[in-house]
C-alpha cells in the first residue's frame, strides 16, 4: 500500500465544477485541469469547498459584486456551509495532514483572494435593460471575497493557520 502524501489543498468549488459559475463566465468546459493536474500528479489530497453563491441563490442568478454579497445573511450562510468543511480539515490536521493552500478565484465577489469584484450602483433592472439607467460597471479591486474572508476566519478559529490563500487569476 503506498504511503499517503498527507498534503491537502483546498479548492474553490468551480475549479472542479465550472457548472456552478454564473452563466457566461465559464472559461473551461468542466474542471480546471491546468491547475488541478499538477496537484494530482504531486499527490496532493483535494478538499472541494461548496459554492456559496450557488447554494445561496441557485444556478439562475445574476452576476453580483462584493457589495451585494456583503450582508449578514450571506455571511451567515457562508459560515454555515463552511462548518462541515472546517470540521474535516481540523480532523485531517489532527491526523497529521498538512493543509498547504487554499486556491480561490481572483475577481470573484465570494472566492477572490487578492482581488474581488466591486461596483454596485443599484436601480431597477428594467431601467438597465431598457437603457434608461446609467451603465453599471463592475471592476476588479484589491481585497478578499466574502466567502474567503469567512473561510480565513473559520480556519484561524480552528487553529489552521500555516497555509497560503492563492487567487487563481482567470482573467488571464
Sequence positions of predicted segments:
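Divalent-metal-activated hydrolytic enzyme cores
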Residues: 4, 59-67, 71-94, 123-172
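Short catalytic/ligand-binding loop motif for oxyanion handling, primarily in non-cytosolic enzymes
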Residues: 18-19, 56-58, 108-114, 118
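Residues lining hydrophobic/aromatic ligand-binding pockets adjacent to catalytic sites
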Residues: 2, 6-7, 18-30, 114, ...
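Short, surface-exposed acidic-centric catalytic microdomains
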Residues: 27-69
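Structural motif
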Residues: 8, 100-103
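Short amphipathic alpha-helices and their capping/turn segments at secondary-structure boundaries
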Residues: 1-4, 31-45, 84-100
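Short, well-ordered beta-to-alpha junction loops that form the rim of enzyme active sites
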Residues: 14, 102-109, 170
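Glycine-rich, phosphate-binding/catalytic loops in enzymes
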Residues: 27-29, 119-122
Amino acid at each position: 500500500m503506498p504511503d499517503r502524501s498527507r498534503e491537502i489543498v483546498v479548492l474553490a468549488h468551480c475549479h472542479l465544477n465550472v457548472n456552478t459559475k454564473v452563466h457566461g463566465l465559464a472559461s473551461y468546459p468542466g474542471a480546471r485541469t491546468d491547475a488541478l493536474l499538477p496537484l494530482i500528479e504531486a499527490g496532493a489530497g483535494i478538499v472541494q469547498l461548496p459554492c456559496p453563491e450557488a447554494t445561496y441563490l441557485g444556478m439562475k442568478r445574476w452576476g453580483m459584486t462584493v457589495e451585494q454579497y456583503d450582508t449578514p445573511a450571506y455571511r451567515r450562510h457562508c459560515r454555515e456551509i463552511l462548518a462541515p468543511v472546517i470540521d474535516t480539515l481540523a480532523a485531517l490536521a489532527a491526523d497529521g495532514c498538512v493543509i498547504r493552500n487554499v486556491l480561490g478565484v481572483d475577481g470573484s465577489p465570494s472566492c477572490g483572494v487578492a482581488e474581488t469584484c466591486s461596483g454596485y450602483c443599484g436601480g431597477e433592472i428594467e431601467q438597465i435593460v431598457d437603457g434608461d439607467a446609467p451603465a453599471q460597471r463592475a471592476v476588479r479591486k484589491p481585497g478578499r471575497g466574502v466567502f474567503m474572508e469567512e473561510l480565513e476566519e473559520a480556519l484561524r478559529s480552528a487553529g489552521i493557520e500555516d497555509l497560503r490563500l492563492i487567487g487563481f487569476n482567470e482573467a488571464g
